[in-house]
């Protein structure tokens, strides 16, 4: 290069520009690999007490659920799901209700 400004004639490319895979030379450390692995959700035991949808008998239900799971189940029970006791189930099965 002669002078204060470079000209196209002064620039010499030694290597051709080629596309490369940006992930080709990367290695993940063990810490990063562990962080990438999804953590198993934490399940908490719950005792649910609800009345039968047929005869108003008290029912107890024991479940293991995540925080999101128990809230979704609660919303279902409050809105559009009714649990029934074994006696009411038989009545429904036999066409009595």
Curated annotation (Swiss-Prot):
Q: Which domain of life is it from?
A: Viruses
Its localization reads:
Host cytoplasm; Host nucleus
Question: Mind listing the UniProt keywords for this protein, alphabetically?
Answer: Activator, DNA-binding, Early protein, G1/S host cell cycle checkpoint dysregulation by virus, Host cytoplasm, Host nucleus, Host-virus interaction, Inhibition of host innate immune response by virus, Inhibition of host interferon signaling pathway by virus, Interferon antiviral system evasion, Metal-binding, Modulation of host cell cycle by virus, Oncogene, Transcription, Transcription regulation, Viral immunoevasion, Zinc, Zinc-finger
Q: Does the keyword rRNA processing apply?
A: no
The sequence motif named LXCXE motif is recorded at 22-26
Quote the record's domain comment: The E7 terminal domain is an intrinsically disordered domain, whose flexibility and conformational transitions confer target adaptability to the oncoprotein. It allows adaptation to a variety of protein targets and exposes the PEST degradation sequence that regulates its turnover in the cell.
Keyword tRNA-binding annotated:
no
UniProt zinc finger (unnamed) residues? 52-88
* Designated name of the protein: Protein E7
Using the record for this protein, list the coiled-coil segments as residue ranges, or answer none: none
Q: Which segment of this protein is annotated as the motif Nuclear export signal? A: 70-78
Molecular function GO terms recorded:
DNA binding; DNA-binding transcription factor activity; protein domain specific binding; zinc ion binding
The UniProt similarity line reads: Belongs to the papillomaviridae E7 protein family.
């Amino acid at each position: 290069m002669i002078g204060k400004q470079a000209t196209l004639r002064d620039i010499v490319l030694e290597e051709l520009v080629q596309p490369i895979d940006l992930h080709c030379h990367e290695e993940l450390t063990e810490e990063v690999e562990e962080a990438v692995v999804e953590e198993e959700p934490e399940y908490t035991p719950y005792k649910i007490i609800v009345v039968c949808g047929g005869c108003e008998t008290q029912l107890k239900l024991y479940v293991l659920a995540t925080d999101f799971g128990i809230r979704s189940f609660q919303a279902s029970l409050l809105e559009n799901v009714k649990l029934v006791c074994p006696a009411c189930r038989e009545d429904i099965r036999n066409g009595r209700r």
